[in-house]
Amino acid sequence: MVASRRAAMAGATRTPDGRTRAPAYVAGVKAALAVLSVALGATLGALTAGSVLMARRVVTPRRREPDTRILALDTAAQTITLSRTPDTVLPGRYGLFTKGTSDYIKLGSVLSQDATSVKRKLLTHIGADAQLEPEAGFSGWYYDRPEQLHLPYTPELIGSTVGPCPAWLFPARDAETWVIQVHGRGTTRAECLRAVPVFHALGITALVVSYRNDGEAPRSRTGTYTLGSTEWRDVDAAVGFARRRGARRIVVMGWSMGGAIALQLSLNSAHRDAIAGLILESPVVDWNLVVKYQARGQHVPDAVTGLAMEALRTEWAAPLTRTGAAIRLDQLDVLSRAGELRHPILILHSDDDGYVPSDASHDLVVARPDLVQMQVFEVARHTKLWNYDQERWSDSIRTWLEGQGLLPT
């Protein structure tokens, strides 16, 4: 019996206090540790994979995705009923990307609404035989082609390091004062068309530009955005183009990510002396804030978001994120570089933006009250301030230009 007990205890271990642990117990602990190790590895792997996917999503140009549904189309009354979203209930004039007999239609005021739907007036005539698919995309563009403005314009090509970038030039009576319009992430030049009549009425020539990887300008080697850290060079080429055409005072207006691009241009351009000021509509001032805000809205864990931002800013992760090189997010944080700003800035931003929070815009005003003025909107959503209150939006720009001495005489 003693022999059998000794055999059973063979391979047993002793604890620090002298007690003996049986082999079965030790084996169980080892198995548990092995399972824990595998689980931990799987968790870390999932976090890493999730962060890489998120980082790619931040920098990869995407096609417009449907965000509402067409529930009914009344061609006799020229009305359309859409599923209710925070955007489709907004007062004002908007656009709708569609599929079928029309690819884009203009929308007027809200006629009625309930808990699930919104009926709006059609401002684009839709024939009785029209067929539209249910999936649609609500837009603040309103105008989607330059000829809809009924203003003289010419198509131009602006030479940049990535190749010729298409632009629209709307000449006005003053050939020396120009505004260069820079669209945002995931959109094209048409986003800026709303602003052209405002400047044209003031006699200011407007140049509406494209930049690398936006679907109109040439593709870079990686085909990804760099959130303003390289795109500003294409806009800098546009500034050079304007100067060669006689521009002496240039206002740069950026929408959303176009605002981030305009700020980088202001900080880095060799043409800084010709830039008279910036107008920023719903701008990205700090990418860290924007990415975190959007990630939380999509219920992405903070750990994944943090790793994604770290992946974007580190050289070793560039092959995984497909950026080609690290993105200097610290250089894109204009709040931390506010002391370097030299140009007067007008910010138009809504506290109900819903996509790019206005916090950083408010903070920039506090950091540089000598240079930065801000018109704060409410209710209006991201880059839809013109649509919501065209009169106030236009007056804000006109008043600021006058205050800066930039109105043509």
Model-inferred region functions:
Residues 2-4, 9, 13, 18-150:
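N-terminal targeting or regulatory segments adjacent to alpha/beta-hydrolase or S9 domains
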Residues 161-212, 216-218:
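Short, surface-exposed "cap/lid" segments of acyl-processing enzymes
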Residues 224-245, 251:
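Alpha/beta-hydrolase active-site loop
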Residues 267-327:
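Hydrolase active-site cap/lid region
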Residues 340-342, 347-349, 353:
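Short beta-strand/loop motif that positions the catalytic acidic residue
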Residues 351-356, 383:
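Acidic catalytic loop of the alpha/beta-hydrolase fold
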Residues 365-383:
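Catalytic histidine neighborhood in serine/cysteine hydrolases
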Residues 380-394:
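Catalytic histidine-centered segment of alpha/beta-hydrolase-like enzymes
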